[in-house]
Design a protein with these regions (language model features):
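Structural motif
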Residues: 37-40, 63-66, 105-108
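Positively charged, low-complexity intrinsically disordered leader regions
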Residues: 1-48, 52, 56
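Conserved small/polar residues in nucleotide/adenosyl-binding loops
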Residues: 113-115
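A glycine-rich helix N-cap at a beta->alpha junction
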Residues: 96-110
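Active-site cofactor/substrate anionic-group-binding motifs, chiefly glycine-
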Residues: 47-94, 99
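Short, mixed-charge, low-aromatic patches
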Residues: 9-11, 76-79, 104-107
Length: 115
């Protein structure tokens, strides 16, 4: 699967849920699947449970993880189109994402805002 943005992207939901239940029986059965792969998690909004569960799932798959808390720490990204880049956001999301994609195999985004 190249892009996953909604439940319909899974195809057969029942089959996906059955596979998830099987994986839960032995969480480490695919621990080599993510070997030498990197997951970048981009958070536009804080979520402790989402961050922990996603990071733990990646670790169970053997993946490395990078967490980027946008606009809540040192990293601020502009999301509006056509904005003059003279404020406190030194990078624009549209320019940063291709670079991130060069370094990471999987990018996950949590955003409760329209970007």
């Amino acid at each position: 699967m190249r892009h996953f943005t909604c439940v319909q992207d899974l195809g057969d939901l029942k089959q996906a849920l059955n596979e998830a239940f099987e994986i839960k029986k032995d969480r480490f059965q695919f621990s080599e699947l993510g070997k030498n792969k990197t997951l970048l998690m981009i958070f536009f909004n804080s979520s402790l449970r989402t961050r922990l569960s996603t990071q733990k799932a990646a670790m169970n798959l053997g993946m490395n993880t990078i967490v980027l808390d946008v606009n809540q720490g040192a990293w601020k990204l502009e999301t509006e189109r056509g904005v003059i880049m003279d404020g406190d956001k030194p990078e624009h999301l549209l320019e940063a994402v291709p670079v991130m994609g060069c370094y990471c195999d999987v990018i996950g985004v949590l955003s409760l805002i329209h970007i």
